[in-house]
Design a protein with these regions (language model features):
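Hydrolase active-site cap/lid region
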Residues: 175-226, 238-240, 283
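Serine-hydrolase catalytic core
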Residues: 69, 80, 98, 225-301
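A short loop-to-beta-strand scaffold at the N-terminal edge of the catalytic core in hydrolase folds
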Residues: 72-83
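Short beta-strand element of the alpha/beta-hydrolase
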Residues: 87-95
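Gly/Ser-rich "nucleophile elbow"/oxyanion-hole loop immediately N-terminal to the catalytic nucleophile
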Residues: 148-167
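An N-terminal hydrophobic leader/cap segment in hydrolases
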Residues: 16-70
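Conserved alpha/beta-hydrolase
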Residues: 107-129
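Alpha/beta-hydrolase active-site loop
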Residues: 102, 133-154
């Protein structure tokens, strides 16, 4: 070979280069496949807090009281209570990464019909205490504290307390009903998965490829928080014997909501909304229909 002339590269060189490239791409793909869900799960452990600001039930012309709830695990939760005028009251549980203002208009509708409404910031959200959000696994403790508060109110009949939850709040509300048969009725919107086992209820093929990565992310949360993996809703819901359920579902929640409505041993009504994706806006999208269905449901079971 003459000086300055580049050496010739044979087939072996290019074959090795191809193998190396394929291996690098495969490793990167695996890291992305498992890494992205874990990164998402880790970021969800410490959600941002959104301030309440100057918003309050007074903006809707409602009288209210500031309340402080204490959970069984000694966290203080802060909220508002709009007194009942008909002897019944509803606990309102907002969605993840929000605060009590996310259920303010639901409270306004309830108050219009005489129902008391207890809105609070769930743990790690708004003004409430809590440092780690473990995918909502412990949020049922917040719902329990809210129910205990209402049972102490002189104007509330302890047998006429309902729970209304949105998205993550829906999961917490539904699970609480599996533990407390004193709840008179449950309205949940956007109810999806509490655990990986619940995710398997979702029959959409698009999820199949992500199942191993999702499973790993759930295990990561258990390891990171030290909080034991909870009972899946699919196992807990059959414990409901008498509490009536109203499940409101858009496309993304249809499979799970349908399953929960069939698994319960109590009365269940499923309102299927022809809306794409994950939705918790029924009150705003269909206000008259929401009022007819939700208030009608509560009137039936809390009368």
């Amino acid at each position: 070979m003459e000086q300055g002339q580049k050496p010739k590269r044979d087939r072996t060189y290019y074959k090795n280069l191809l193998v190396f490239t394929v291996r690098v791409v495969a490793i990167l793909a695996i890291l992305l496949y498992f890494g992205v869900p874990i990164i998402d799960a880790n970021s969800a452990l410490h959600p941002p807090r959104f301030p309440i600001g100057d918003v309050s039930p007074a903006d809707l012309g409602l009288e209210y009281e500031d309340v402080t709830l204490t959970t069984r695990d000694h966290l203080k939760l802060y909220g508002w209570y709009i007194p009942s005028t008909n002897g019944a009251a509803v606990v309102l549980v907002h969605a993840f990464s929000g605060n009590r203002t996310g259920t303010l208009y639901h409270a306004g509708l309830l108050a219009k019909h005489g129902y008391g409404a207890l809105l609070y910031d769930t743990r790690t959200q708004g003004e409430s205490e809590g440092e780690v959000y473990a995918l909502g696994w412990e949020d049922y403790l917040d719902v329990e504290a809210a129910i205990d508060y209402l049972k102490q109110r002189a104007e509330v009949d302890p047998g006429k307390i309902a729970v209304l939850g949105l998205s993550a709040g829906a999961k917490a509300s539904l699970y609480t009903a599996t533990q407390d048969d004193s709840i008179a009725a449950v309205v949940v919107e956007g109810t999806r998965w509490r655990t990986f086992e619940d995710l398997l209820l979702d029959t959409e093929p698009k999820w199949y490829v992500w199942l191993p990565a999702e499973w790993l992310s759930w295990q990561f949360v258990e390891w990171k928080t030290g909080i034991r993996h909870p009972t899946p809703l699919r196992e807990a819901v059959p414990r409901i014997n008498t509490t009536p359920l109203l499940l409101i579902a858009a496309d993304a929640e249809l499979a799970t909501s349908q399953a929960y409505s069939e698994l319960t041993n109590g009365p269940a009504t499923l309102w299927v909304r022809d809306e794409p994706g994950h939705q918790i806006d029924a009150l705003f999208d269909e206000p008259e229909e929401y009022e007819r269905r939700a208030i009608g449901f509560l009137n039936e079971w809390l009368d």
